């Protein structure tokens, strides 16, 4: 019978060194919670056999992954990594696991391939863990060996050279593979007799050695991908490495990225071969950029769809909006959630759309607000046009028919419909529906008087 291996992510800590109100695992990297990168690394290996221990501001962590299929275990009191494992043990055992891989939730650089290799090396051990060798071990737990055999892991603040000898530069990377039936008898023996007063998962190593179990430390050199994030400086360094990794991945897939060192792309974004991106630029969330689409510099996109042949000019802001084939956006345009541009539509400088649709070939080239509106095919919206969609209590819809022409500086007070082929004179305030093929003018008649001069 094949053995079953699962994974447990430790994500309950406060992350006090971040000096943030957010839990550490929710700190942002390229617009995504740090924890998402750990999920991305582990899900290909463990699928549904993946649990996350949460504790500090647990509801905030749940909310960040709302709608996603994750298994959470709550550590009511944050009493250390060993206590977190104890809190999750019942669920791990109920799942029938033979082994569990334990990973810290603050390792956003962790590659799937590294975990897969570690699993192969750890399969014959009762307790296995990954180690790094660093010139400056800092606050990481030290790996104590005797004749190359692992003896213990000792936290930096508890290390005593009189007991363990000269301080080593080999540190614990915080990734473990534990055989369930072997470790189960050790868990109750964890104590908090240390300077932090916490139950350390690292103490399982010393206990396993004392029981003559098979314990191995898998040496990984100086691999920076295994290091955790503990403070803002480390977060920034990790984000820079992730950003470079993602940009290189898309370049290798034939996406043309100019100044890639200035382009920030979410791990959930999808770029098709032949897309062209100019930095600096930010592409977040589940954005999709199609082939032959161009996104120019200083643009900000989140959950945006940019279809084939579309162009987004500089300084445009696009969020939860759809830009159709061969559309043109900007410069300095803002598409808010619910904005949809159909094929060949154009939105120019200082135009804002929200819950509005520009149908095929429609244009709003200058200084316009389109909110809760539908603009028919081929319609033209003049500069300074405003759809007045909010009466102070409710939002109302504006419908502009096919081929309609709205003159500059017009206000369309919703709910209102402008019929197909109709023309609204410049400067009008339209409060009533306009039939098809009509001319509507709603403004004061011009009066011209002789100029009076001072005597």
Curated annotation (Swiss-Prot):
Binding site for acetyl-CoA: 383, 389-390, 408, 426, 443
Chain spans, region Linker: 233-253
Active-site annotation: 366
Keyword Transport among record annotations: no
GO MF annotation, one: UDP-N-acetylglucosamine diphosphorylase activity
The protein's name in its UniProt record: Bifunctional protein GlmU
Gene name in the database record: glmU
Superkingdom in the source lineage: Bacteria
Enzyme Commission numbers on file: 2.7.7.23, 2.3.1.157
Keywords, sorted A to Z: Acyltransferase, Cell shape, Cell wall biogenesis/degradation, Cytoplasm, Magnesium, Metal-binding, Multifunctional enzyme, Nucleotidyltransferase, Peptidoglycan synthesis, Repeat, Transferase
Organism of provenance: Nitratidesulfovibrio vulgaris (strain DSM 19637 / Miyazaki F) (Desulfovibrio vulgaris)
Class of enzymatic activity (EC top level): transferase
Homology family: In the N-terminal section; belongs to the N-acetylglucosamine-1-phosphate uridyltransferase family. In the C-terminal section; belongs to the transferase hexapeptide repeat family.
């Amino acid at each position: 019978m094949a053995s079953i291996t699962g994974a447990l992510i430790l994500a309950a800590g406060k992350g006090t060194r971040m000096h943030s109100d957010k839990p550490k695992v929710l700190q942002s990297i390229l617009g995504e919670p740090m924890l998402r990168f750990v999920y991305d690394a582990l899900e290909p290996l463990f699928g549904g056999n993946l649990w996350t221990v949460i504790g500090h501001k647990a509801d905030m962590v749940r909310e960040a992954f709302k709608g996603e299929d994750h298994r959470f275990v709550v550590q009511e009191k944050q009493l250390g990594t060993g206590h977190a494992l104890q809190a999750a043990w019942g669920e791990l055992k109920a799942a029938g696991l033979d082994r569990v891989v334990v990973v810290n939730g603050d390792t956003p650089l962790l590659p799937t391939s590294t975990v897969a290799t570690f699993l192969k090396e750890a399969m014959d051990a009762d307790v296995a863990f990954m180690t790094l060798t660093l010139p400056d071990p800092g606050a990481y737990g030290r790996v104590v060996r005797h004749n190359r055999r692992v003896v213990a892991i000792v936290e930096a603040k508890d290390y005593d050279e009189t007991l363990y000898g000269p301080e080593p530069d080999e540190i614990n990377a915080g990734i473990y593979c534990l055989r369930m039936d072997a470790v189960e008898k050790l868990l109750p023996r964890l104590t908090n007799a240390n300077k932090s007063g916490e139950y350390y998962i690292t103490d399982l190593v010393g206990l396993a050695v004392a029981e003559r179990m098979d314990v191995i430390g898998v040496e990984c050199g100086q691999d920076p991908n295994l290091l955790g994030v503990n403070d803002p400086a480390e977060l920034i360094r990790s984000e820079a490495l992730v950003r470079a990794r993602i940009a290189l991945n898309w370049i290798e897939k034939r996406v043309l990225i100019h100044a890639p060192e200035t382009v920030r792309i979410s791990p959930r974004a999808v770029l098709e071969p032949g897309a062209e991106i100019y930095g600096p630029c930010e592409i977040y969330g589940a954005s999709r950029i199609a082939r032959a689409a161009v996104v120019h510099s200083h643009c900000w996109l989140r959950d945006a769809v940019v279809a084939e042949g579309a162009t987004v000019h500089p300084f445009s802001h696009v969020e939860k909006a759809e830009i159709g084939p061969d559309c043109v956006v900007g410069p300095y345009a803002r598409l808010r959630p619910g904005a949809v541009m159909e094929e060949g539509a154009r939105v120019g400088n200082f135009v804002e759309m929200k819950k509005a649709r520009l149908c095929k070939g429609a244009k709003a080239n200058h200084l316009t607000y389109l909110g809760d509106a539908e603009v028919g095919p081929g319609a033209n919206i003049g500069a300074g046009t405003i759809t007045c969609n909010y009466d102070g209590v409710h939002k109302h819809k504006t419908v502009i028919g096919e081929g309609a022409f709205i003159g500059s500086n017009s206000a369309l007070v919703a709910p209102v419909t402008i019929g197909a082929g109709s023309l609204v004179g410049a400067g009008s305030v339209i409060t009533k529906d306009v039939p098809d093929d009509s001319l509507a003018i709603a403004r004061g008649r011009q009066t011209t008087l002789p100029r009076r001069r001072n005597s």
